[in-house]
């Protein structure tokens, strides 16, 4: 198998993992809005597992590049420039990966904002409860 063929296999596997992660981040939004803490913990564990899978695929990709005499931090764009075959498929995969990563990143920002709003709401309510239970001092 050529470098590009092996790389395409790894990138497709990473893409599938990222799709699953993306689905979880969208599901996480609904769980945060519903304030379902136990489900949030479950989904966070699933996210961690997927992130670990991605890390393993990245190590596999780095080993592949090393075995082909390339630096492990070489970009897909550089590989596309240097190799004649599989350029089109690598370009498509690169774009899909970039778009998916952007989507995950933006959804995570939304989720973080929702969590922050929930924390502020809880803090406000705790202060309200505390202030109504504390007798006034004169």
State what each model feature region is.
Residues 78-138:
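Short terminal interaction segments
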């Amino acid at each position: 198998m050529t470098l590009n063929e092996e790389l395409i296999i790894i990138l497709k596997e990473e893409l599938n993992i990222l799709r699953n992660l993306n689905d979880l981040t969208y599901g996480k939004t609904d769980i945060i809005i519903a304030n379902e803490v136990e489900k949030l913990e479950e989904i966070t564990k699933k996210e961690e597992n997927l992130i670990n899978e991605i890390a393993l695929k990245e190590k596999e990709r780095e080993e592949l590049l090393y075995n082909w005499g390339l630096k492990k931090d070489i970009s897909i764009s550089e590989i596309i420039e240097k190799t004649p075959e599989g350029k089109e498929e690598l370009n498509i995969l690169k774009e899909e990966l970039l778009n998916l990563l952007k989507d995950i990143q933006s959804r995570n920002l939304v989720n973080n904002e929702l969590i922050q709003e929930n924390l502020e709401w809880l803090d406000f309510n705790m202060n309200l409860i505390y202030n109504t239970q504390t007798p006034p001092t004169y």
